[in-house]
Amino acid sequence: MGDLRDRAKYLTYTKLAAGMANIPEAWAHWIAGTVARTMSMRSGPGTPLAMSQRHLHRTLASECVEGVEPDPALVRRWARRTFREYGHYWADGARLPFESEAGIRSEFQLERGRDHLEAARALGRGYVMALPHVGSWEWGGAWLALEGYPMTAVMEELHPPELFEWFVAQRKAMGLTPVPLGEGSSGPLIRAIKAHKVAGLVSDRDMVGNGVEVTFFGEKTTLPGGAATLALRTGAPLLPVVVYSAPGNWHSGEVHAPLDTTRTGSLRDDVARITQDLAHVFEMMIRRHPEQWHLYQPNWPSDHEEEGGAKA
């Protein structure tokens, strides 16, 4: 039965992606958005909708006057919008491997930070890019490859293995070099930096469970320390980057100034300091477009407590 479910999962993903790539873009966005919104139909503790609402409550509460809570109706509305945006993300990812260079360039605009890219390149080495789960970062990665900044990016392993292999092939077609998340991922990233390439890490979720404690949207949690560790060990600049989806089916990228990665103490202390600085930049990025934050898993200790209570 497990093999049948795995096969069905593989066929569902691959056939849907093939369909998205062969229909008009507007149709693909509508279909994918509709399918994704079905995820929001289930409510209650521990569901994707509930997790999105918890994350957005923190995001909006961080902008409120102390003691004032965000409007629950507003939180629900924004949370449901994330599913539509998530569908658009999947539709874009399905057609991106088949896009021409002209198509990729025409639908991407680097709104801010080209000077940071050029300054990092002038140093004669690669650099580290840290991103949140916002918008369509793969589109930015494909554009970077065309601009001469090829990216080696960490990718969470998926099950079944043939589905993971399919996703790897898709990202290679985008100009990205995927590396499975795990103990062996640092080697390829370091080699990419030494080859004057980009090491990309999506860093707003501690998927392994061995992250660095930070305050993120006013609450203690852990975030991955990999980006900070790589920058400290290689001397590469650490650039926070975000790619938003914009009206008219195009994408808007921003490269922020490099974080201060000066060695000031022990490696552990410096990684903690830099990761906290990165968390503050991510807060700013996410606040600008909270509806594009695709995070439906527990990300704070209190989220795990709620999920555990729901299962009980």
Where does each model-flagged region fall?
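Short, flexible loop segments at the rims of nucleotide/cofactor-binding pockets, characterized by
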Residues: 103-109, 156, 175-181, 216-218, ...
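Membrane-anchoring hydrophobic helices of lipid-metabolizing enzymes
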Residues: 1-128
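Catalytic core of membrane glycerolipid acyltransferases/transacylases, capturing the structured
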Residues: 96, 123-183, 209-212, 216
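Short Gly/charged-rich anion-binding patches and loops
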Residues: 15, 51, 115, 139, ...
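Non-catalytic C-terminal accessory region of glycerolipid acyltransferases
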Residues: 2-4, 8, 62, 66-71, ...
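Active-site metal-coordination segments of metallo-dependent hydrolases
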Residues: 46-51, 157-161, 220-224
